[in-house]
């Protein structure tokens, strides 16, 4: 051999290896072909070193180094951590039995044949190593083999027939039977034999594998989903949906995360949530799902479906559920107010088509939205139009009283002191003055931030409503005493200064004092008349000096 290293291999335009061409040709059919082609081009330079370019080699320099060690007889140990790289490298380099016996490809295939005897951790580790050479491993069928191995291992430790079938077993069994591969049919059959009537809510029996599988990349998980035939709209498995939610929770998007890689998994999770939402997920859980999945660029269709389910049960939400931080795409404000508006529209639309306890649900959501408005009012980026859009999303029947909404308006006015008079007037249009309690109406009238015309309008509405609907026994007494003295007001008009409405308390006190004085005079007059009548009766009967015959007047 004239040159020990007469072959230069430039690998993936990054690494260079110097090897003996005769030795490497004994094991690799791919390199043998390239060497022959290079020799034909260099007939006049027989003693010169041959240079060949190898691109898109799986495993990079580490993988090629393992191959060279095998060819040079250095001995390599095939295990679950390197078998995927060695298998893909041997297929790429065509290291078959045609060249030499017990070549590298045959050895990796024999090792993979024992996959169904591997431990659970070994299969997961091998799948993880496939991520380095995923495109090659997938095209060579290695990923499919490992996925089938994982799916066969899961039922050995849990009853997860629902992973491989619909949440309602009869819904799609016949439809999917014809499209099953032999491996999938075997896994389904194996899991069906082990299925029992145990509950699937137990984390220890059905979800023990969630954390282990969460170390895998999105491409591997998508392969698993596709193998089960549950991709996107075909997902009707509750356990699989829970796994996807758990998986995506551990992959919270950040600067180094490609959201598009997970968008398909997020859409599949949404379909599973929508399919089993009302029976498997509470309202709070649904908001958690929305928070998790919104960061992965889910499709418009998936978002609409998810918001529809949440909107239908919105009356079960709490204030914390609604306080979802605003997104970063040009959305101003602390909280995602547009989301709440969309959910309210769904709730109201569904409420108009349902009967029964819808009025109770509507009043419950009315109280919740008033609390929500009070919470978001201090936000300096919250526009008046957006505040009104939230407040006016509900009909008047959703609020027995508008006191809570007035308090939200007051907080907004205090937090936005530079608001114009026009905007302050506009802000108050969502109030139903007839549904304000007497105390709240008095507060509104004295509030210097409320435009005077609004205060007058509220007081007029309060007069009309109080005549027909007093709020309490104490208010009823006040209302009767005040409005029964209108004749007195007509006879003695009073100048009213609207500025600041500081006259309201003094006006009521004067009114009450005059009314009590008139009532006392009337009572004293009646007492004197009765006393004189009794005295005249006593004189006629000759008992003028007997005080015992006088009746009690009070």
UniProtKB/Swiss-Prot annotation:
Residues 545-554 have a biased composition (Polar residues). Gene3D superfamilies: Potassium Channel Kv1.1, Chain A. Pathway: Protein modification; protein ubiquitination. The keyword Electron transport does not apply. Residues 5-80 form the BTB domain. The keyword Ribosomal protein does not apply. One of its GO terms (biological process) is protein ubiquitination. Pfam families: BTB, NPH3. Residues 522-534 have a biased composition (Basic and acidic residues). Keywords: Ubl conjugation pathway. Residues 522-554 are annotated as: Disordered. Residues 207-465 form the NPH3 domain. SUPFAM superfamilies: POZ domain. The BTB/POZ domain mediates the interaction with some component of ubiquitin ligase complexes. Belongs to the NPH3 family. May act as a substrate-specific adapter of an E3 ubiquitin-protein ligase complex (CUL3-RBX1-BTB) which mediates the ubiquitination and subsequent proteasomal degradation of target proteins. This is BTB/POZ domain-containing protein At3g19850. It comes from Arabidopsis thaliana (Mouse-ear cress).
């Amino acid at each position: 051999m004239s040159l020990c290293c007469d072959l230069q291999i430039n690998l993936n335009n990054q690494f260079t290896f110097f090897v003996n061409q005769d030795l490497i040709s004994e094991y690799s059919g791919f390199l043998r072909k390239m060497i022959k082609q290079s020799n034909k081009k260099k007939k006049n330079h027989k003693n010169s070193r041959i240079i060949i370019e190898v691109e898109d080699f799986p495993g990079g320099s580490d993988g090629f180094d393992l191959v060279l060690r095998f060819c040079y007889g250095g001995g390599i140990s095939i295990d679950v951590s390197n078998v995927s790289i060695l298998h893909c490298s041997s297929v790429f380099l065509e290291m078959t039995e045609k060249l030499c016996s017990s070549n590298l490809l045959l050895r990796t295939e024999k090792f993979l044949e024992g996959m169904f005897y591997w431990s659970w951790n070994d299969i997961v580790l091998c799948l993880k190593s496939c991520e380095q050479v995923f495109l090659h491993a997938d095209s060579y069928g290695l990923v499919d083999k490992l996925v089938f191995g994982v799916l066969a291992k899961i039922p050995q430790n849990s009853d997860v027939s629902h992973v491989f079938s619909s949440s309602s077993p009869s819904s799609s069994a016949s439809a999917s039977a014809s499209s099953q591969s032999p491996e999938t049919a075997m896994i389904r059959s194996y899991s069906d034999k082990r299925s029992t009537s145990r509950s699937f809510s137990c984390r220890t029996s059905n979800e023990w594998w969630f954390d282990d599988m969460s170390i895998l990349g999105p491409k591997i998980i998508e392969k698993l989903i596709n193998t089960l035939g549950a991709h996107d709209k075909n997902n009707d498995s509750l356990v699989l949906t829970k796994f996807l939610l758990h998986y995506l929770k551990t992959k919270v998007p950040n600067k180094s995360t490609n959201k598009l890689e997970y968008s398909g998994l997020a859409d599949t999770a949404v379909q599973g949530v929508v399919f089993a939402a009302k029976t498997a997920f509470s309202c709070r859980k649904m908001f958690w799902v929305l928070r998790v999945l919104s960061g992965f660029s889910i499709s418009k269709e998936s978002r609409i479906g998810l918001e529809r389910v949440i909107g239908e049960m919105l009356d079960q939400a709490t204030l914390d559920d609604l306080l979802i931080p605003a997104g970063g795409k040009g959305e101003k404000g602390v909280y995602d107010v547009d989301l709440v508006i969309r959910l309210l529209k769904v709730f109201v639309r569904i409420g108009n088509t349902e009967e029964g306890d819808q009025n109770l649900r509507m009043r419950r959501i009315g109280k919740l939205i008033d609390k929500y408005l009070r919470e978001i009012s201090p936000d300096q980026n919250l526009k008046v139009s957006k505040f009104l859009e939230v407040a006016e999303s509900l009909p008047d029947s959703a609020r027995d009283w508008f006191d809570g909404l007035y308090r939200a308006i007051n907080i907004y006015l205090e937090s936005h002191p530079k608001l114009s008079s026009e905007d302050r007037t506009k802000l108050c249009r969502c109030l139903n003055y007839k549904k304000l309690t007497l105390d709240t109406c008095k507060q509104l009238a004295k509030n210097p931030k409320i435009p005077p015309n609004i205060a007058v309008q509220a007081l007029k509405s309060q007069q009309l409503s109080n005549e027909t609907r007093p709020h309490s026994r104490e208010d009823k007494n006040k209302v009767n005493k005040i409005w029964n003295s209108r004749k007195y007001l007509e006879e003695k008009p009073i100048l009213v200064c609207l500025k600041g409405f500081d006259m309201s308390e003094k006006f009521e006190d004067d009114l009450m004092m005059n009314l009590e004085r008139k009532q006392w005079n009337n009572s004293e007059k009646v007492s004197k008349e009765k006393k004189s009548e009794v005295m005249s009766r006593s004189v006629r009967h000759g008992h003028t000096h007997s005080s015992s015959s006088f009746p009690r007047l009070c």
